[in-house]
Amino acid sequence: MAKVYEFLANGFEEVEALAPVDILRRGGIEVKMVSVTGSNLVESSHGVVVKADLLFENITDFSDADLLMLPGGMPGSKNLNEHEGVRKALKEQFEKGKRVAAICAAPLVLASVGLLKGKKATIYPGMESYLGEDAEYTGALVQEDGNVTTGAGPAASFPY
């Protein structure tokens, strides 16, 4: 069975975090929401508190993952970007040729780790500069390029 980990930091966007988890779980895919806050309770950018399945610090590695996923939102995306463990896990996943995905503002994390070099990508409108010069911004609602999927914002939560 496919396995997905979604990283949650305080300030995440609710729809971008929960819609993909709900859809994937309904499809029979094992999805684990992983808190990077040190607590299972993670607060969204609009004050909604979600209980994550796992704590990042209790996981030794993510080698069993088929996909690592990042929801957007602010300051959630910046908080994910500041978490060295998340950055390392994404890089290792990408280097193994496995899938990574980020939506809304969260593609900035993929870009800062260097995973968007030479890739087509999208991001929340107005944040294009966060993709850096190495990515090709497409403006698409959802963009796939190899093992990387990016989404432009809340409206992309379902097709993403």
Where are these regions (language model features)?
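Active-site-adjacent pocket-lining segments in enzyme domains
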Residues: 3-6, 12, 23-39, 53-160
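A cross-family phosphate/adenosyl-ligand binding-site feature
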Residues: 44-53
